[in-house]
A protein has these predicted regions:
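Short, surface-exposed basic-aromatic patches at helix termini and helix-loop junctions that form
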Residues: 99-107, 134, 154-164
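Glycine-rich phosphate-binding loop signature in dinucleotide/nucleotide-binding domains
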Residues: 21, 132-139
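Alpha-helical substrate-recognition element adjacent to the catalytic core
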Residues: 2-119
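Non-Sec secretion/translocation targeting segments of pathogen effectors
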Residues: 199, 206-209
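Structural recognition of alpha->loop->beta junctions
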Residues: 104-116, 177-186, 190
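Donor nucleotide-activated moiety binding/catalytic core segment of transferases
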Residues: 119-135
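Acidic, Mg2+-coordinating phosphoryl-transfer loop and its flanking beta/alpha structural elements
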Residues: 138-186
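Surface-exposed amphipathic alpha-helices with a cationic face
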Residues: 75-79, 133, 155
Length: 209
C-alpha cells in the first residue's frame, strides 16, 4: 500500500465513523433536565400540575428567567462529537421557547414537542419517539429525563436511560460547585457556574466556525 492509498483509506474510515456517530440518537428532555424552569411551575390546590397556569407563564418575560442546568455541558460535548441530538419535551413550543434555545446555543437536530396534544407526558413522548425512530438509520443511544415514567418509555425503544437529576448532581460535584441540602430522598435542582457553562459553550461554538 502506497502513501496515497493509505490516505484515502484513512479518509474513508473517518467518513464511515462520522456517519455511524451521526446515526446514533441522544435525546434530552428540557424542563428539569437541561433547563431550570421551576419558577414557572404551577399547581392546582390539590398539588396536580396546572397546565393552563404553565401556558400563561410561557411568555418571554418569564422564560428569559429560566436557567441552564449542568447537563448542558454534556449536550454541547455530544453536539461537538457529531451525534444526532434531539429534544423530547412536553412543552407546546412557541417563539419565546425557541428564542431561549437560540440565545443559549441549544441547537437541536430535531425538537419533538407537544403541539396541540393533551396527552400525558409519557404517552406523548412514546408517540413522538415511535414516529421519529421509524425513519431508517436512526439508532437509539442515550435518553436524559427527570421522570421515571418517561425513562421507562425510552427503554422500550432501546435507549440507555439517564436520570437527569443524578447527572446534574454529578456534574455539580465534579466541577466543585456548592452542594447544599442533599439527602437520599431530596435531590435539588442545581445551577452551574456561569464561567463553566461559558467554557463548554465556547468549545462547541469554536467547532462551528
Amino acid at each position: 500500500m502506497n502513501l496515497n492509498q493509505a490516505v484515502q483509506m484513512r479518509k474513508a474510515f473517518k467518513k464511515e465513523h462520522t456517519e455511524v456517530i451521526k446515526r446514533q440518537v441522544i435525546a434530552f428532555d428540557l424542563d428539569h433536565t437541561l433547563i431550570d424552569s421551576s419558577h414557572r411551575h404551577c399547581t392546582h390546590p390539590d398539588g396536580s400540575f396546572n397546565l393552563q397556569g404553565w401556558i400563561e407563564k410561557s411568555t418571554w418575560e418569564h422564560i428569559q428567567k429560566d436557567v441552564l442546568l449542568p447537563l448542558c455541558h454534556h449536550f454541547w460535548a455530544f453536539k461537538e462529537a457529531g451525534f444526532t441530538v434531539i429534544a423530547v419535551t412536553a412543552r407546546e413550543m412557541r417563539e419565546p421557547d425557541y428564542r431561549f434555545l437560540r440565545e443559549n446555543d441549544l441547537e437541536f437536530d430535531a425538537i419533538l414537542e407537544r403541539g396541540n396534544s393533551k396527552e400525558l407526558d409519557e404517552q406523548l413522548k412514546n408517540g413522538k419517539l415511535r414516529e421519529f425512530l421509524s425513519q431508517e438509520g436512526r439508532i437509539p443511544y442515550l435518553f436524559f429525563d427527570d421522570k421515571d415514567e418517561n425513562l421507562e418509555v425510552a427503554k422500550k425503544y432501546g435507549f440507555q436511560t439517564m436520570k437527569a437529576q443524578l447527572f446534574n448532581l454529578k456534574t455539580v460535584v465534579k466541577d466543585y460547585h456548592s452542594v447544599r441540602n442533599i439527602n437520599e430522598n431530596n435531590i435539588e435542582t442545581f445551577s452551574p457556574k456561569e464561567e463553566d457553562l461559558a467554557k463548554s459553550k465556547i468549545n462547541y461554538l469554536n467547532r462551528k466556525i
